[in-house]
Amino acid sequence: MGEIETLMLPEMADIWQQTLGWQPEAEQRQQFQRLYELILVGNRQLNLTRITEPTEFWEKHLWDSLRGIAPLLSSHSEGTSDRLSLPSVERAIDIGTGGGFPGIPIAIALSHCTVTLLDATRKKIAFLETLIDQMGIQNAATLTGRAEEIGQHPQHRASYDLALVRAVATASVCAEYALPLLKPGGLAILYRGQWTEEETNALQPALVQLGGVIESIEGFTTPCSHSDRHCLYLRKVAPTPREFPRTVGLPAQKPL
């Protein structure tokens, strides 16, 4: 994949611990560094990310990815909800993974969980397949396709404990992508920037149709750039009707 630039990520051990109640082990830090280097190389051919400066990459791709699963990393994480019930997670899917975020950092952090990286762009999936192989990540797999099609596929529908959606579409569209893929009791995590009560109210009718409820909304500030972020935790409490997800393109064109 070409020569790798030798830019080093910051260690940030104290910030990991203070904000997530967790910090990576030495091998995980090495994997994060290797991931960063391979993403920089891949960026020469593919538009994977505009975030390439080491501290910004650490915050917006590594820390942000893992902030969403903070309850899985530590039951005593600062700022996470005691009400959020997260049993053992064996299968997760990252919908619209792009350059592999949040899926790959989560696979590195949760070695017991198999993470499927879903994207419709074949070139990005081909890159991620090579990256996973080069990094020796055993608990990550790739899948090329649209969420609307994968959600109707018997091999994937109602098959995952955890669904991750970051920077893909409006919340109701993300919910329509994610909830059909979850087992009963499964959890969808929607990574958002700003979030308002009006958006919560607008999301509710879609969740009623999809068999989901809002279990928790976590607001937080990023540790370096001090930006406002939110994670929405949606619980699947009833089977998703067979009509969802609707055909390719329709969820975005006509949101629930």
Feature map (PLM): residue ranges:
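Class I SAM-dependent transferase core
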Residues: 2-89, 93, 123, 129-140, ...
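Compositionally biased, intrinsically disordered/low-complexity regions enriched for serine, proline
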Residues: 7, 21, 84, 99-102, ...
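S-adenosylmethionine
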Residues: 113-116, 120-256
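Conserved SAM-binding loop of SAM-dependent methyltransferases across substrates and taxa
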Residues: 99-112
